[in-house]
């Protein structure tokens, strides 16, 4: 898409001749159950932010209902946009663009955000920026940490995704591994819900956070009490549906045995440890593969809702340190779905003059196709080796024990022939 010269020049002139001018972008996020709006500027300031989620209805319905989410977005977006503008002390004419999530996510939910963004951009004659939700998660670190430089590795873990990638630039990503089925957040959520009522202290708390709290109360070896086999998936890919299925089957067997009571904290600790070991084993393969090619970035950014889990983050950090990689976690407030990351990703695309932007209001279509699934970047899985030289001893990701590896070459050495005297 060609950038209209007059719009491009206006933005450049503002930044050159207005000493205190800072580009401002309104972001809209509706990929799932969070209705979110935010305004950020080029100085990396969050001028305003609003988020709304109907958790009570989700608890009543036992999870996320896409139609309910869409209705929530439609009813609340106008109010949240107006409040953001008021809180920021900004009028629409002071904005430089509108950014909106277009993929991936629940299509029916995405459409509501897209519709609101199109209407706002056309009404106020602003450029419209389509943003990739998962890229925004990775790029959100740039909003709060100026030490991060391209290229950096990005591990994104959420209720809908799990992927291992490298961010080479704002819109240039390489995908090295992803979940072939399920996600870590959904796995933990569904298994935990089958445990039943976790107690009144967890009312109003996301079930994933409840699992982490309960796991912290487990016995010393609680993380080993309910083990399952890790999924066998090629290269750096993952499978969380297999983990979910194994634990649901285990729960069913335990309940059929009337003599066995389930220790909830130990069960949560085992589930959490299994998810962490699976992620770590695949991240290790990624590290080994890129290290052999001498192109492993020295910074690793962890984002997405599951990154808020301190145990899983700790396991990844511990493994990364063993590979001489610095781990950086996105702020807790930016780990879950938010509009700040959408606005700032859009701002980066704007100042980099992205060809994906609809610069002229008259060129903005009446609708934009929403995609349920969309890879974060180009497929680079062919660069991942099938069998790394060293195998991670996954049990060592727990606690303070030093990370250990097994050199696979040792297993291939021929045994010395026995001698007889």
Swiss-Prot record:
The keyword tRNA processing applies. GO terms for cellular component: mitochondrion. The keyword Manganese does not apply. Disruption phenotype: Enhances longevity, resistance to oxidative stress, and perturbs mitochondrial reticulum morphology. It is found in: Mitochondrion. A divalent metal cation binds at residues 133, 137, 337. SUPFAM superfamilies: Actin-like ATPase domain. Residues 1-22 form a transit peptide. It catalyses: L-threonylcarbamoyladenylate + adenosine(37) in tRNA = N(6)-L-threonylcarbamoyladenosine(37) in tRNA + AMP + H(+). Belongs to the KAE1 / TsaD family. PANTHER family: TRNA N6-ADENOSINE THREONYLCARBAMOYLTRANSFERASE (PTHR11735), TRNA N6-ADENOSINE THREONYLCARBAMOYLTRANSFERASE, MITOCHONDRIAL (PTHR11735:SF6). Homodimer. This is Probable tRNA N6-adenosine threonylcarbamoyltransferase, mitochondrial.
């Amino acid at each position: 898409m060609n950038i209209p010269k007059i719009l491009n020049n206006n933005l450049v002139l503002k930044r050159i001749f207005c000493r205190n001018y800072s580009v401002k972008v309104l972001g809209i996020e509706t990929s799932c159950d969070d209705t979110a709006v935010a305004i950020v500027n080029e100085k990396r300031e969050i001028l305003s932010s609003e988020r709304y989620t109907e958790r009570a209805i989700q608890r009543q319905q036992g999870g996320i209902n896409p139609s309910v989410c869409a209705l929530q977005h439609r009813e609340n977006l106008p109010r949240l946009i107006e409040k953001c503008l008021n809180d920021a002390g900004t009028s629409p004419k002071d904005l430089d663009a509108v950014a909106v999530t277009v993929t991936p996510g629940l299509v029916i939910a995405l459409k509501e955000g897209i519709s609101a963004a199109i209407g706002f951009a056309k009404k106020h004659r602003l450029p419209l920026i389509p943003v990739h939700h998962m890229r925004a998660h990775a790029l959100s670190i740039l909003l709060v940490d100026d030490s991060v430089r391209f290229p950096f590795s990005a591990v994104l873990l959420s209720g809908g995704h799990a992927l291992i990638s490298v961010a080479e630039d704002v819109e240039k990503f390489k995908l090295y591994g992803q979940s072939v089925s399920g996600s870590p957040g959904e796995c933990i959520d569904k298994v935990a819900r089958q445990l039943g009522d976790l107690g009144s202290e967890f009312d109003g708390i996301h079930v994933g956070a409840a699992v982490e709290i309960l796991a912290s109360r487990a016995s010393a070896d609680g993380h080993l009490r309910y083990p399952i086999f890790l999924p066998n998936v090629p290269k750096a890919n993952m499978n969380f549906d297999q983990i979910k299925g194994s634990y649901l089957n285990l729960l069913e067997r335990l309940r059929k045995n009337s003599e066995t009571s389930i220790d909830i904290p130990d069960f949560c600790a085992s589930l959490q440890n299994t998810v962490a070991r699976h992620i770590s084993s695949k991240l290790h393969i990624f590290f080994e593969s890129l290290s052999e090619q001498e192109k492993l970035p020295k910074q690793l950014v962890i984002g997405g809702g599951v990154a808020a889990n301190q145990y899983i983050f700790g396991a990844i950090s511990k493994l990364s340190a063993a590979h001489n990689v610095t781990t950086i976690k996105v702020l807790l407030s930016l780990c879950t779905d938010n509009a700040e990351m959408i606005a700032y990703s859009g701002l980066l695309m704007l100042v980099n003059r992205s060809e994906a932007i609809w610069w002229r209001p008259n060129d903005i279509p009446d609708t934009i196709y929403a995609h349920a699934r969309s890879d974060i970047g180009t497929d680079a899985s062919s660069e991942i080796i099938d069998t790394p030289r060293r195998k991670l001893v996954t049990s060592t990701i727990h606690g303070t024990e030093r990370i250990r590896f097994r050199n696979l070459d040792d297993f291939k050495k021929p045994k010395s022939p026995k001698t007889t005297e």
